[in-house]
Amino acid sequence: MWGENIATADLFANATDIHSIVQALTTLANASDVFFLVVMGVLVFMMQWGFAMLEGGQVRKKNVNNVMMKNMVDWLIGCVAWLFIGGILCSKGFDLSAFIDWWKQILGTNWPNNGLDLASWFFGLVFCATAATIVSGGVAERIKFSAYVLISLIITGLLYPLFVYLGPWGASIVPWHDYAGSLVVHGLGGFLALGAIAALGPRIGRFVDGRPVPILGHNIPMAVFGAFALAIGWYGFNVGSSLALGDISGLVCATTTMAMAGGGIGALIASRNDVLFTANGIVAGLVAICSGTDVVSPIGGLIIGLIAGLQVPIVYKLVEKAGLDDVCGVVPVHGTAGVIGAILTGILGLKIFGGAGGVSLIDQIIGAVFCIIYGTGLGYILAKIVGIALGGLRVSEEEEKMGLDMAEHKMPAYPEETVI
Amino acid sequence: MWGENIATADLFANATDIHSIVQALTTLANASDVFFLVVMGVLVFMMQWGFAMLEGGQVRKKNVNNVMMKNMVDWLIGCVAWLFIGGILCSKGFDLSAFIDWWKQILGTNWPNNGLDLASWFFGLVFCATAATIVSGGVAERIKFSAYVLISLIITGLLYPLFVYLGPWGASIVPWHDYAGSLVVHGLGGFLALGAIAALGPRIGRFVDGRPVPILGHNIPMAVFGAFALAIGWYGFNVGSSLALGDISGLVCATTTMAMAGGGIGALIASRNDVLFTANGIVAGLVAICSGTDVVSPIGGLIIGLIAGLQVPIVYKLVEKAGLDDVCGVVPVHGTAGVIGAILTGILGLKIFGGAGGVSLIDQIIGAVFCIIYGTGLGYILAKIVGIALGGLRVSEEEEKMGLDMAEHKMPAYPEETVI
Amino acid sequence: MWGENIATADLFANATDIHSIVQALTTLANASDVFFLVVMGVLVFMMQWGFAMLEGGQVRKKNVNNVMMKNMVDWLIGCVAWLFIGGILCSKGFDLSAFIDWWKQILGTNWPNNGLDLASWFFGLVFCATAATIVSGGVAERIKFSAYVLISLIITGLLYPLFVYLGPWGASIVPWHDYAGSLVVHGLGGFLALGAIAALGPRIGRFVDGRPVPILGHNIPMAVFGAFALAIGWYGFNVGSSLALGDISGLVCATTTMAMAGGGIGALIASRNDVLFTANGIVAGLVAICSGTDVVSPIGGLIIGLIAGLQVPIVYKLVEKAGLDDVCGVVPVHGTAGVIGAILTGILGLKIFGGAGGVSLIDQIIGAVFCIIYGTGLGYILAKIVGIALGGLRVSEEEEKMGLDMAEHKMPAYPEETVI
């Protein structure tokens, strides 16, 4: 295996004319696309670990294992739902023949062009799993594990792929510009969470006599490491969204970087040096830039990030004032940041503002409204239906006080610190 | 440096005929292979960090620094052993002239084709280090640090490369299909650990009057983060095993993903929502798919993963019943999962089951038996010899009770929580 | 989006003659360079997370959130400083017209060749941010957050880019061989820290009656995970420094690996199994190899690493003896390791020692001396000026005792373990 090199250069060993060169180049190009989609997809898959740390750090010790299980299991279930349903629904809608062709193909190993279709399937999967796992951060510390698993299954198998199909990545029934999913992934995740949060109700002790009482997480550095891992993975999220090596864009890399910087600085200023808001501001800046990362200038990226970061502490307080317990602030970090990003794309993407053009503010606003209604509405309805189906959406009051780690998984997160 | 772009495109600036184009393409192809092997190798190297977290979370506070040292030092030693011996032994066997040529070459900087041979050497190294570090999880909390270092040196310098040479990646004296090492790396690591565990004996208090008494690790989230890091790295492990960009396979990416999902879901079900078994089930699914990841269908991958995940809690109990103290469950997660994966490759790799064909169940069974005997036998013998050479394999009872962090490294893992 | 493949292979669909093939190849080459620079740059960006863990683990619980904020904010500020000033100053010096052209360009989206210039800009940014964040580890646990932010701004906007411009990556006014920045990044960062440490003074209780009193960090495994993340990122640091896919070098990958091994083993031996020194030895080996990673042999890399690792505990003691409180040992790990690596490049890079040649020991010594003077001098002056500008460089004694997390950020790192 090592030492004897099977080299890609062998492709060109017998290339002696135009035709044979082009044939060899086509193989190299397909292989390069598979490599591109796998590396970018693995970076996005790293965001599952990032979300587990970001959410894990922001919950109490007695619920950390439950967060670990939710973040592992929504990925595991997402893979199966995306293989059998999601991956086809999102591009072909409810076309039964397309499903049957696909089911036949995944029973075999006949995948031409170095398996490019499966690399593309993988890149779609990690986007779907990201949308689903965002909800976890909003409903933490009181949702039943079985309810969360069922909600994840329905999001990854139906709600997300259908939203994709209706939006710009599918049949464009509702067309807006969304290069890497400010609305398709993050806005949807954030507003699905809003609906579920409303259906679920707040944690015990989160509001006392209508007054909000902060419930701090157990490990702030763990949450910051989560933000770092998300920021690293985000380069796969945005730069990978060219879907082909040949269309990769250095501009997307730069606007992603500057929006991250703007998001962190905006939240740092608005929260007066708060560690968690600064970390979440970085994520909000990255959420906001997804939509227009390919059509705004680097300065435009910085501006989008700044606005997205500044709004995080503000919207967090508004959600709290509405009596909603959004544990990890997913509504401001993914919901409203996604909407703001999409709308600003319709402005800073215009040529007069240095953008590449080809965007319309109206389309962006329509997309945003559609996302808010689709997400919040279906998030609420889904949570209520699952609650009925499982005899309740929440663990019992006694279980919530004991902590979900012991109640649902029979194991504390830090055994030597807990008398079992 | 920045701003003035030395671009790869310059390769083609003077390409004016077939010959000059092919020459430039050969350079691009070699450079792309080096880039491919480095990126995939770095993902596998990330698994060293994953193993450090997976094992670190599953030991008590008083032994965490010792786990950190074992996982750093088996890598450091593996680099040296692989440079001087392992990297040649695995492909050329005991051919002295090949060793001499290699030793001359590593004293210099003459490495043609963009140093492709050294990129290939690096990719072989990270596989070797993975096999060695698996043993660490089985022998934790009571092995002498010096004994572990010596065992690692012999595994990375002799036992692993020799096993590679005898198997399908070397001279194929024992031929079986093992695309990314279900047996060559993980089965070997798991059964070497079994042999060493048997030679070492259990931790104090692990069995009382013959009854097993669980000794919980100190940080379950740390272990789960380890499983996430391993899963991320595994895409380098499997997809990188094409060894050349031109042979990359999207099918390998998909079967790896589905086996991960099957492994986690299988262990989740078999352990009734246990956090550690679910995380280890994800790893077991990934171990099992290595062998046939290129010849089974995506559904085949899911099935292999499910079976590998289901068996983890079952085999863990059997090993425990046999009075063996496998701290991190490396026998079920790497040993039996590797064997199951290899054997199922001989079934689900057949054309009648949608596989790509070119596999034989008999070969797979022979390879599995060879791996179990070679690993367990040499693991036991090696541990016994090292024990004799160092005046004992284990730290003293007093040191084991104090904890290896203070006994062997004079520093607690969490200084502010420990009175020194 | 998924399912309908826009493939890179389409580039060659209409390539029917030499000219059209070369045109398509130029696009593929540029896209490959952008992909190369983004992936390598993301690996280096991962080192920000590595530094946050390495430093976070080596400070006490009451200062961990402050370390998180410093490591997030020096990145955020670095992005902005590098976009507006640093990225141009480093290659064009104080050429106003070059600044104006650049500022015009970043207000727009006109970036040819797949945005290759912006990918190159991004790769420069992550190097700059690395140099700045090294200082954080030296000044931890007593510097004002506002002072640190201002120091980072001036390092990333002025001191680092100017040093680059003067050195081998810019106008080469002081020419030495520094492939990936032993001096340009790490030596500079280490000696800037030395100057700032001298200006800042030690932590309360670090020296009692002139005798050094160790102040242990709170989480050694966190620091080791930081070293792992840095080592992973370092492959981007060194292998990415070819700046173009076509010039990638497998030799750089191998010498980087062997220097890492030498560094860890050297520090392990010199510190007699100390966990933190071994982890920092790995980093020191990687620092030292940056300069000559492309011109020394794999054995040369091992030797450079060994020497760099051996010196870490020795220089740490010398700095301590000088009454200087270098919390994370950045002077031996980045400063002197960088100088040693640069000088050894002038020896082991020579042909007689198996090197590729083209290096001069005199140049390397001149570069080292220039770096020590530039770094220590400007580090000291900058810290003093910032101290004056902000009414003091340090937090008050009372704040230092309370801990910077509560004093500067109003939030403990582990809320459930602290009575707020």
UniProtKB/Swiss-Prot annotation, chains A, B, C:
It holds the Pfam family Ammonium_transp. It comes from Methanocaldococcus jannaschii (strain ATCC 43067 / DSM 2661 / JAL-1 / JCM 10045 / NBRC 100440) (Methanococcus jannaschii). GO terms for molecular function: ammonium channel activity. It comes from the Archaea. One of its GO terms (biological process) is ammonium homeostasis. Belongs to the ammonia transporter channel (TC 1.A.11.2) family. The keyword Transport applies. It is a multi-pass membrane protein. GO terms for cellular component: plasma membrane. The keyword Cell membrane applies. Involved in the uptake of ammonium/ammonia (NH(4)(+)/NH(3)). Transport is electrogenic. The lineage of its organism: Archaea, Methanobacteriati, Methanobacteriota, Methanomada group, Methanococci. This is Ammonium transporter Amt2.
